[in-house]
């Protein structure tokens, strides 16, 4: 990531006629290192691969410096049966969507970054990079997408609580804060996690019943 310094730029700040180059990293690359790969094996096989602790710290440094602008998930829900093929046959990639926010908010709770950083990397900055109309901010005329989270109580990641069809998470066993309590799309609650639902939570609407396709305008 170091060689990208002074090359990447947020589209909203781009000037001149040069190329707009944006970058992203994943919660997995900001969390795991070679010791996790040694323990978890092909569960953590992905491309680019999980590397060493000093590489992870380089990503953090360049993320906070603005060279890397966004947090993505690279969600690739391969089955455990496929992952059990071992090296090199197991496919690269892993589930990542449903733990992404809690992982990053846990990093914020632990002092690696601020809450405002997470909002920028996962909401406003992403909307900027992709010119998403009405997304990334709470403001008049926007789409009204909101997530309410619990920053006080930690819960472990359990495979049996995942929503992905493949039923596992690379973060299994990790204690995370920042779990979503309510998700609102276009002003409509679509998911909740309460004592009655248990930690897995429940969906409140049918898939596709709320929200519209994301509109992205050209950069220039």
Which functions belong to the PLM regions below?
Residues 30, 80, 156:
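Conserved protein kinase catalytic core
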Residues 49, 116-117, 158-163:
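Short, positively charged
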Residues 86-89, 143-211:
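C-terminal cap of metal-dependent C-N hydrolases
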Residues 1-23, 78-95, 127-135, 206-220:
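Short, electropositive alpha-helical surface patch
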Residues 43, 70-71, 76-153:
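His/Asp/Glu-enriched, well-ordered alpha-helical/loop segment
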Residues 44-55, 91-95, 169-175:
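A short acidic, glycine-rich active-site loop
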Residues 1-71:
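Histidine/acidic residue-rich metal-binding segments in metalloenzymes
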Residues 25-26, 75, 151, 174:
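Fold-independent oxyanion-binding glycine-rich loops
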């Amino acid at each position: 990531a170091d060689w990208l310094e002074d090359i990447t730029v947020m589209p909203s700040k781009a000037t001149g006629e040069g190329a707009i180059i944006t970058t992203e990293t994943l919660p997995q690359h900001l969390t795991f290192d070679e010791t996790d790969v040694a323990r978890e094996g092909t569960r953590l096989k992905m491309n680019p691969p999980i590397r060493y602790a000093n590489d992870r710290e380089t990503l953090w440094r360049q993320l906070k410096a603005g060279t890397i602008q966004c947090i993505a998930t690279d969600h690739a829900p391969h089955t455990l049966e496929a992952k059990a093929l071992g090296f090199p046959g197991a496919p690269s990639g892993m589930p990542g969507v449903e733990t992404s926010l809690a992982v990053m908010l846990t990093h914020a709770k632990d002092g690696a970054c601020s809450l405002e950083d997470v909002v920028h990397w996962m909401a406003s900055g992403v909307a900027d990079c992709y010119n998403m109309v009405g997304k990334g901010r709470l403001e008049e005329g926007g789409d009204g997408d909101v997530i309410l989270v619990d920053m006080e109580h930690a819960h472990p990641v359990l495979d049996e609580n995942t929503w992905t069809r493949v039923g596992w998470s690379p973060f299994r066993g990790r204690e995370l804060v920042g779990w979503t309590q309510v998700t609102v799309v276009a002003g409509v609650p679509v998911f909740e996690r309460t004592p009655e639902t248990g930690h897995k939570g429940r969906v409140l609407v049918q898939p596709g019943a709320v929200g519209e396709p994301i509109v992205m305008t050209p950069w220039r």
